[in-house]
Amino acid sequence: MAEELITPVYCTGVSAQVQKQRDKELGLGRHENAIKYLGQDYENLRARCLQNGVLFQDDAFPPVSHSLGFKELGPNSSKTYGIKWKRPTELLSNPQFIVDGATRTDICQGALGDCWLLAAIASLTLNETILHRVVPYGQSFQEGYAGIFHFQLWQFGEWVDVVVDDLLPTKDGKLVFVHSAQGNEFWSALLEKAYAKVNGSYEALSGGCTSEAFEDFTGGVTEWYDLQKAPSDLYQIILKALERGSLLGCSINISDIRDLEAITFKNLVRGHAYSVTDAKQVTYQGQRVNLIRMRNPWGEVEWKGPWSDNSYEWNKVDPYEREQLRVKMEDGEFWMSFRDFIREFTKLEICNLTPDALKSRTLRNWNTTFYEGTWRRGSTAGGCRNYPATFWVNPQFKIRLEEVDDADDYDSRESGCSFLLALMQKHRRRERRFGRDMETIGFAVYQVPRELAGQPVHLKRDFFLANASRAQSEHFINLREVSNRIRLPPGEYIVVPSTFEPNKEGDFLLRFFSEKKAGTQELDDQIQANLPDEKVLSEEEIDDNFKTLFSKLAGDDMEISVKELQTILNRIISKHKDLRTNGFSLESCRSMVNLMDRDGNGKLGLVEFNILWNRIRNYLTIFRKFDLDKSGSMSAYEMRMAIEAAGFKLNKKLHELIITRYSEPDLAVDFDNFVCCLVRLETMFRFFKILDTDLDGVVTFDLFKWLQLTMFA
């Protein structure tokens, strides 16, 4: 049995972000040009296996215990005892990938709590075009079989092509997880494996919302409806959604974990994900009745109330009409009245598809835009509006609404612009094995005042203290995504996505969906420094008292070394009892000398020390001004305001880097680190200004100049 050794080359940090942006500009990540997940190329790997006469084994998701899980399905769990990884060709003499097209009965739940995923897969079978975006044509256990398959999934704004081998978890010769009702089709089991791979393990799929899988199969965006507060036109909404090819799922909420997957007296499963597969009207006793068709991934547990498979209501429906609805017994699919649907279920999810997924000129297409962002402790993770001191540091996005809705779209007489906002946190399932789960997330929308219109600047704390939000996410909740349909008058608005509490880190995707065109942009400050012209005094112009002080400090050589500078600064700072500091380190002082040393001798002369001295005095004034709680140190967020007061405007990425480099583990910034940061910033800006001879904001270095500058900066 072959093992295909995959050795992808990874970029890290800033270089990874640059490479990702270049890939996006080249069109990578679109469905027609999907990114090869983990660098694995399906066609090349398959061709290599066929050429060598071996079957593929995926070292990126190997048939070992950690691929199953980390706790309930971990290496020492009794639930994984006896599991063996086998290929379908070892289980059956004639396994099939798909027989007569993919159908809803191909999906039956196994021992994994991923009914939410299987409900989405069942809905996927209703639309052949969408199905084969996820499950590419041309895969088989017969012609060209090499033990390798591939699937395409949408992952946080981009499509990825995921390769898997066909080694599946089995126990006693049967599949442990998803399987087909007939037992001889394996496309759904292999799709489940691909989904487990991108999420880190099978166990990572346990528990979730159908909307997650809906979106990962389509790139669409999901809306939620509380069926206890259902709008009066919900049945029409469902009909239109099905007509548009949307994917629908529903469930019954539970209030106690002991109720999870408990069966009601009418045979519905609590906390279990169902897919909505159709909606029709039938004539019953002379009246039209609204019906909903449901699918239970378990297969055999079906609704036993009115309009169930063997209920008497069907006897009073015209046989032709009954045949059109294809009522079958015990196949996991059943009909129920819309009235009972509202009464029995508590939540409905509708995944609206994007224009590229719909591929139809007859349907109204969405205008879509998305942005990727991060929340980082101390710089961009400000928490929700309950934390006014830090809320303003969150990433901000502007949306410009110009075209109002068509008059017949809404009942309201007031004109307005409708759009859908969706905030998604990234990679949280994959991080479950490290003890991290979903953060509580949401967003707020603010109207931009007329005097600030058109300005692409990050709004500061005072704005949010003085202005209330115009809209917000309905809840802050620990789901992968929160979304809301919002309607506002034309104008400019600021969207602020956040975690509920400050300093909760994560990556996110913010998506805008609108039926009318709307302008969007990410807000960030432009990098600039408002520095006064540097006035360099000659030795004769320097105050005599300062010369006397310098003579005492410098010694016989009349220059201050790195060690002498450390002694001087720490002696001075120790007299300021209101400052929290560990003192200037030798490395910090070496950095200051390197940055201020103009003649390159590694020491500071009278003029050089005079410049540094005056700067430190100015920095002390700023530090005390922005140490708002008089703790002797600044918080990371106070640091951001202090940097701006010192004349520097930086974008959020630079603020992230500064906090990473200059703050303590508790995100406090001591005076010594504050000084080092500002000295470095000012010197680097001045270096750049000198080197930017064309004044075009671009400087070109050869390798020597680059190393010379960066090694001693």
From Swiss-Prot:
Residue numbers binding Ca(2+) 1: 597, 599, 601, 603, 608
Pfam families xref list: Calpain_III (PF01067), EF-hand_8 (PF13833), Peptidase_C2 (PF00648)
Residues of the site described as Cleavage: 15-16, 27-28
Domain of life (superkingdom): Eukaryota
Ranges where the record places region Linker: 526-541
Cofactor(s) in the UniProt record: Ca(2+)
SUPFAM superfamilies, per database record: Calpain large subunit, middle domain (domain III), Cysteine proteinases, EF-hand
Signal peptide: none
Chain sites annotated for binding Ca(2+) 2: 627, 629, 631, 633, 638
Chain spans, region Domain III: 355-525
GO MF term (any one): cytoskeletal protein binding
EC number: 3.4.22.52
Keyword Cell cycle appears in the UniProt entry: no
Annotated transmembrane regions: none
Catalytic activity: Broad endopeptidase specificity
Record's cofactor remark: Binds 4 Ca(2+) ions.
Catalytic residue list: 115, 272, 296
Gene Ontology cellular component terms for the protein in this record: cornified envelope; cytoplasm; cytosol; glutamatergic synapse; lysosome; membrane; mitochondrion; plasma membrane
PTM description: Undergoes calcium-induced successive autoproteolytic cleavages that generate a membrane-bound 78 kDa active form and an intracellular 75 kDa active form. Calpastatin reduces with high efficiency the transition from 78 kDa to 75 kDa calpain forms.
Keywords: Autocatalytic cleavage, Calcium, Cell membrane, Cytoplasm, Hydrolase, Membrane, Metal-binding, Phosphoprotein, Protease, Repeat, Thiol protease
Subcellular location: Cytoplasm; Cell membrane
Subunit structure: Forms a heterodimer with a small (regulatory) subunit CAPNS1.
Family statement: Belongs to the peptidase C2 family.
Record function comment: Calcium-regulated non-lysosomal thiol-protease which catalyzes limited proteolysis of substrates involved in cytoskeletal remodeling and signal transduction. Proteolytically cleaves CTBP1 at 'Asn-364', 'Gly-377' and 'His-399'. Cleaves and activates caspase-7 (CASP7).
Protein name: Calpain-1 catalytic subunit
Organism: Rattus norvegicus
